[in-house]
From Swiss-Prot:
Zn(2+) 3 binds at C709, C714, H727, C733. One of its GO terms (biological process) is positive regulation of transcription by RNA polymerase II. Residues 905-974 form a coiled coil. Zn(2+) 5 binds at C801, C806, H819, C825. It comes from Rattus norvegicus. Residues 29-76, 162-213, 325-354 are annotated as: Disordered. Detected in brain. A zinc finger (CCHHC-type) spans 344-387, 388-431, 700-743, 744-787, 792-835, 845-888. InterPro entries: Myelin_TF (IPR013681), Znf_C2H2C (IPR002515), Znf_C2H2C_sf (IPR036060). PROSITE patterns: ZF_CCHHC. Keywords: Coiled coil, DNA-binding, Metal-binding, Nucleus, Repeat, Repressor, Transcription, Transcription regulation, Zinc, Zinc-finger. This is Suppression of tumorigenicity 18 protein. It is found in: Nucleus. GO terms for molecular function: DNA binding; DNA-binding transcription factor activity, RNA polymerase II-specific; DNA-binding transcription repressor activity, RNA polymerase II-specific; RNA polymerase II cis-regulatory region sequence-specific DNA binding; RNA polymerase II transcription regulatory region sequence-specific DNA binding; zinc ion binding.
Length: 1032
């Protein structure tokens, strides 16, 4: 009983107002319950939820007390963190300080039970004996009665006090002075009321004493809780076990109140109650320990799960945030890198396309996303001419005399700076050679080395006059080096634009052995023009004792002037030769050159008479050091050659390069080398020369002379791909344009497959990608469909090819299957190849009207050099002119052999064989085409027949459908009319027996000759009458 009062005092912690309301309510319900039947309190307490919280009774209705689950206490603080404060102060819990109010509801009950009953076992024996002794003294009956009333009040308050109470904070503990008011504790729903008004003064003594003992009980846990805040689970389980003793003690006072109030019976029952309590406490300890262990295990498991899920949620949120940030960072960094990479430099950010309305996007070639000039603008076609001209003037190459064509790396057709200019590269190379030659000339040159270099330079002279030292071991290299002299663009600029390069005379040279020889300088002024062909003399110096400064460059100047002035056929006389130096002047008409480098090739020239001064001796030499050196494409053609051509022929007669006119009878020899030397030895009026020994030319030099670049004005340097330093064909020439390449391809037409309609692709064996003859053609021996001529060609006979033996097939360019003129005829091209240099006109040309054409034999006028005109009618723009000039130096046999080697055909038999095969293919194709035409006519006739049959079938089907519909109508009418008439041995007429009915009727009417009975005749008459109404 004393434990019940101790617990009731500990748990009665409410505010004064709430405690007062609860005490009044308990007193009122206790009086009402005194007349009623008591309820088993043990059973009602056992029905509480496992984690029942007394605060729920104060906050919620009794119906909602069991809604919350006890598992939610996993995340809340346990009873180990409870701190017990003095009785007059507020008891603060760690869970109460948190922001979750639900945690107090689940944690208050077990925490208070554990802390309040923790040390109950220490005072259990002493207090229980003292309480029993006091209760059994003279006033034992009244004390038991008071305790029973208090128990009833406690029970009644427990059942209904949740409706009148409100959630509150932890109230202070009760003091000894407040024991008579007995304020309630709403956390566990048990109320304890004071019955001081009913008890006497003797009853108050034990209560005060008990209150004093309760104060001692509360002070001891306070000290222990401050020292040790973490209480073991065993003490908590023991305290909970002892905390359930008051529950068992409530049963006995209720039973005592019903029995007769005799002192002896009450004393015996109180002793039994104390004994029963001690037994039940031991049983409750075991169950409570198991319960608390399960609660602790569940709390730990819940905390682990809660922590795990919390960490998982945090990880997922971080991962999602990183994924969202990563694309943004990548995009931003990518944009920054792209902008840094492709953004123009600070000084070029203002550069943009000059075309109005263009933002610079869309480069023509697609290599760049933007453009900043007219070169790559896709809207360049729609640009006004003023803007185009203004920008084109700015975008020209700064090198004088350069048109911008012939870019070095071949990625572009033109260039606008010195970086890709071949002329600038040649000038730079020439300057380096000048420096190296100047350094080498200072060291001196031996007589043997000078002799060897002079021998090499007999074919072509270098325009520099200084000496070149070379060791004896590298003699063959020197011969290869000087065998083909590169074209000097700087000298061309000097001739055209008046630039005078510095001349350096070699030192250490020996004096000439002829004292009479005088060196004439050639101070010709080339401000706006080029020297004429007749204003120069040839240099016949061949002796090894002469220095390089004594060699004349007039032959090269004359060749260049002749190439540039071929269309005018200028024939200028040689200038007056004076004894004084610097008296040789070119007084002929000069070629005018405008600021853009365009030459004036008009035919109006002033012819000046020759005024020659006899030389001082027969051995006088005219050696003109080149004040303005000039060479053209390694051609060795002197002024005498052109003068002979001009003197022997008129202005309007085309030049025939197949025969050399300047030779005398003594100089006609079979050796091509001697013929070349004889050309140089030919003497004309106004020239002074000396006989000199002629050393033999090497065969190696002769071969190298044959394989030079055929492009006019190209020295072979500056290969397109950069893999080679020089080239000897048009394929790698940076100065060759597309028209020249197409012309060369047209002239070498034998390298294409002769099969009509075949482009050369698809070799039979697969070893080669293309073929040039019928041997590997997959279409040669197949009976495929031939590209037949169109109907217009069959109708118009005038539009056929004029070449005899040609059927109009096999166009040269491959774009058309047939041709109607001789321009694309492959047979005409073959016949031109057979006789390239004979002046005889072809047979098919006789039928056509004579038109102005190129005077060079074998040239069809296509492929102008500067690409201004599609065709040319003079030698000025002929790309084959340079080749023809070079071929004059060799015999006709070498030329024919070279043509046959390039064409790939060694004899005429193969050509005839190919022609026969082509004719056979044409015949087979014609037969196949005739068969195909027959088949097509048969197919068309069969198709027309099928169409007529189908139309007839459609008509028949329509008629059948109409007849069926009519038959159905007649049958229905017959059935309706004969419905009342019934034949013997047959049922009434219907759709099932309609056919049998009709058959019997037809038999009856067909056999009318028989003698029927009167009944049958009457039936037939009735049938006739019924059928009369049907109209067919």
């Amino acid at each position: 009983m004393q434990r019940l009062k101790i617990k009731r005092c500990i748990l009665s912690q409410k505010e004064p107002k709430v405690a007062y309301d609860c005490s009044m309510a308990k007193k009122r319900r206790a009086e009402e319950q005194a007349l009623g039947v008591p309820v088993n309190k043990r059973k009602s307490l056992l029905m509480k939820p496992r984690h029942y919280s007394p605060d729920m009774d104060c906050k919620e209705n009794p119906d909602n007390r069991n809604e919350d689950d006890g598992l939610e206490t996993n995340d809340h603080s346990t009873a180990d963190e409870i701190v017990v404060k003095p009785m007059d102060k507020t008891l603060h819990l760690p869970a109460q300080e948190s922001s979750l109010p639900k945690e107090d509801q689940y944690a208050c009950y077990p925490e208070l039970m554990v802390k309040s009953l923790m040390h109950l076992g220490k005072f259990e024996e002493s207090e229980s004996v003292q309480t029993v002794g006091e209760n059994l003294n003279g006033n034992g009956i009244q004390s038991l009665k008071a305790e029973c009333d208090e128990a009833n009040e406690c029970f009644m308050v427990h059942s209904d006090d949740g409706r009148d109470k409100v959630h509150h904070s932890q109230p202070p503990f009760c003091s000894s002075g407040d024991s008579e008011s007995d304020s309630d504790n709403t956390e566990n729903g048990w109320g304890s009321g004071s019955n001081s008004s009913e008890d006497t003064d003797t009853h108050k003594g034990p209560k005060r004493k008990l209150t004093y003992n309760r104060k001692d009980l509360l002070e001891v846990p306070e000290i222990k809780a401050e020292d040790d805040k973490f209480i073991p689970c065993e003490n908590r389980c023991d305290s909970d076990t002892s905390g359930r003793d008051p529950q068992n003690s409530h049963m006995e006072p209720l039973a005592v109140k019903v029995q007769p109030s005799f002192p002896e019976v009450e004393e015996s029952e109180s002793l039994a109650t104390v004994i029963a309590e001690s037994a039940e406490v031991e049983k409750a300890k075991g169950s409570l320990s198991l319960l608390e262990q399960a609660i602790a295990l569940q709390a730990e498991r819940g905390s682990v799960f809660h922590h795990t899920y919390k960490e998982l949620d945090r990880f997922l949120l971080d991962h999602l945030a990183r994924q969202r940030r990563q694309p943004k960072v990548t995009d931003a960094s990518g944009r920054q890198i792209f902008n840094n990479k492709h953004s123009p430099r600070p000084e070029r950010r203002e550069a943009k396309c000059p075309i109005p309305g263009c933002d610079g996007t869309g480069h023509v070639t697609g290599l760049y996303p933007h453009h900043r000039s007219l070169s790559g603008c896709p809207h360049k076609v729609r640009v006004p001419l003023e803007i185009l001209a203004m920008h084109e003037n700015v975008l020209k190459c700064p090198t004088p005399g350069c048109t911008g064509r012939g870019h070095v790396n071949s990625n572009r057709n033109t260039h606008r700076s010195l970086s890709g200019c071949p002329i600038a590269a040649a000038e730079k190379l020439a300057m380096t050679q000048d420096k190296s030659q100047l350094d080498s000339s200072q060291t001196g040159q031996g007589p043997e080395q000078a002799h060897r270099v002079n021998l090499v330079k007999q074919i072509e002279f270098n325009f520099r006059s200084q000496a070149i030292t070379s060791p004896r071991a590298s003699a063959s290299k020197e011969q290869e080096k000087f065998g083909k002299v590169p074209f000097d663009y700087a000298s061309f600029d000097a001739q055209v634009f008046g630039k005078r390069p510095l001349l350096q005379t070699g030192q250490g040279q020996k004096a000439p052995p002829f004292p009479e020889s005088k060196h004439f300088s050639n101070p010709v002024k080339f401000s706006n023009g080029l020297p004429s062909a007749g204003a120069h003399t040839q240099s016949t110096v061949r002796a090894s004792s002469y220095g390089h400064g004594q060699y004349s460059e007039d032959t090269h100047i004359a060749a260049a002037a002749a190439i540039l002035n071929l269309s005018t056929r200028c024939r200028e006389a040689t200038d007056i030769l004076s004894n004084k130096p610097q008296s040789l002047r070119a007084k002929g008409a000069e070629i005018e050159v405008d600021e853009n480098g365009t030459l004036d090739l008009s035919m109006k020239k002033n012819r000046i008479l020759d005024k020659s001064i006899p030389p001082t001796s027969s051995h006088t030499t005219i050696a003109t050091p080149s004040s303005s050196p000039f060479k053209a494409s390694s051609l060795l053609v002197n002024a005498a050659f052109y003068q002979a051509l001009c003197d022997q022929e008129g202005w309007n007669v085309p030049i025939n390069y197949s025969k050399s006119h300047g030779k005398t009878e003594e100089e006609k020899e079979k050796d091509p080398v001697n013929s070349l030397e004889n050309l140089e030895e030919k003497k004309f009026a106004g020239e002074a020369s000396i006989p000199s020994p002629k050393p033999k030319l090497h065969t190696r030099d002769l071969k190298k002379e044959l394989i030079t670049c055929p492009t006019p004005g190209c020295d072979g340097s500056g290969h397109v791909t950069g893999n080679y330093a020089s080239h000897r064909s048009v394929s790698g020439c940076p100065l060759a344009d597309k028209t020249l390449k197409s012309l060369m391809a047209a002239n070498s037409q034998e390298l294409k497959c002769p099969t009509p309609g075949c482009d050369g692709s698809g070799h039979v064996t697969g070893n080669y990608a293309s073929h040039r003859s019928l041997s590997g053609c997959p279409r040669a021996r197949k009976g495929g469909i031939k590209m037949t001529p169109t109907k217009e060609e069959k109708e118009d006979s005038e539009l056929r090819c004029p070449v005899i033996g040609c059927d109009g097939q096999g166009h040269i360019s491959g774009k058309y299957t047939s041709h109607r003129t001789a321009s694309g005829c492959p047979l005409a091209a073959k016949r031109q190849k057979e006789n390239p240099l004979n002046g005889t006109p072809l047979s098919w040309k006789l039928n056509k009207q004579e038109l102005p054409h190129c005077p060079l034999p074998g040239c069809n006028g296509l492929g102008h050099v500067n690409n201004v005109f599609v065709t040319h009618r003079s030698l000025s723009g002929c790309p084959l002119n340079a080749q023809a000039i070079k071929k004059v130096k060799v015999s006709e046999e070498l030329m024919t052999i070279k043509l046959k080697a390039t064409g790939g055909i060694e004899g005429d038999e193969e050509i005839r064989h190919l022609d026969e095969e082509i004719k056979e293919l044409n015949e087979s194709n014609l037969k196949i085409e005739a068969d195909m035409m027959k088949l097509q006519t048969q197919i068309t006739s069969m198709e027309s027949n099928l169409k007529t049959i189908e139309e007839e079938n459609k008509l028949i089907e329509q008629s059948n459908e109409s007849l069926l519909k009519e038959l159905a109508g007649l049958s229905q009418a017959l059935i309706s009319s004969l419905a009342d008439i019934q034949l013997p041995q047959m049922g009434p007429i219907n759709e099932q027996n309609f056919e049998a009915y009709v058959n019997t009727l037809t038999d009856m009417y067909s056999n009318l000759e028989r003698d029927y009975s009167p009944e049958c005749k009457a039936l037939l008459e009735s049938i006739k009458q019924a059928v009369k109404g049907i109209h067919v």
